[in-house]
Amino acid sequence: YIRHNAKEKGIADFYIAQRVGSILEEPNQRGLAHFLEHMAFNGSKNFKNTPSSPSIVHWCEAHGIKFGTNLNAYTSVDETVYNVSSVPVKHESTIDSTLLILHDWSHYLDLDDKEIDKERGVIHEEWRTRRAGMASQRLMEEALPIVYRGTKYEDCLPIGKMEIVDNF
């Protein structure tokens, strides 16, 4: 969708929402949808993270788009959403490159073994901080198997199982 926004002239937000999430994982894949979302920032067809081809994160930060704030994504039970927000759109090339990022996210991720191994630690830290600092996360881990007993929803938290994240 394209929607006019008169409040912030010269700025645009870009999203790609996919109807895929942890509910589509098999039990031996718990956490892989979320892991793939993380890998979207570690290299793609057109953003390689090499001296001649900056990574998505480096390209965005060079254009004033902050990783984690204006460049982010999330995976839920039934969707994965990527966004690049507050993009300065004075130049057509910036719009083109941002659309190329969305294109790469939907089709052309690089899944380099070294990057995968590095990302395992990032996922572990996210899991640890959510469990340590968020009672709601621990409550969901306890409640979902009871509330959704007998359905696919009883065991499909997007963060997944760390033993699967470690060993796929």
Kindly give the residue locations of the regions a language model identified.
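Mature N-terminal segment immediately following signal peptide/propeptide cleavage
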Residues: 1-13
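M16/MPP (pitrilysin/insulinase) zinc-metallopeptidase core fold and M16-derived inactive scaffolds
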Residues: 10-85, 148, 154-167
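Exposed, low-complexity coil/turn segments of extracytoplasmic
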Residues: 35, 92, 125-127
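Short alpha-helical scaffolding segments that buttress acidic/His motifs in well-ordered protein cores
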Residues: 36, 98-102, 143
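M16/insulysin-pitrilysin zinc metalloprotease superfamily fold
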Residues: 43-46, 84-119
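Surface-exposed patches in mature extracellular/periplasmic domains of secreted proteins
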Residues: 51, 68-73, 110-116, 135-136
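Acidic/histidine-enriched alpha-helical segments
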Residues: 52-58, 110-128
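Short acidic/His-enriched helical or mixed secondary-structure segments at domain edges of catalytic enzymes
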Residues: 122-147
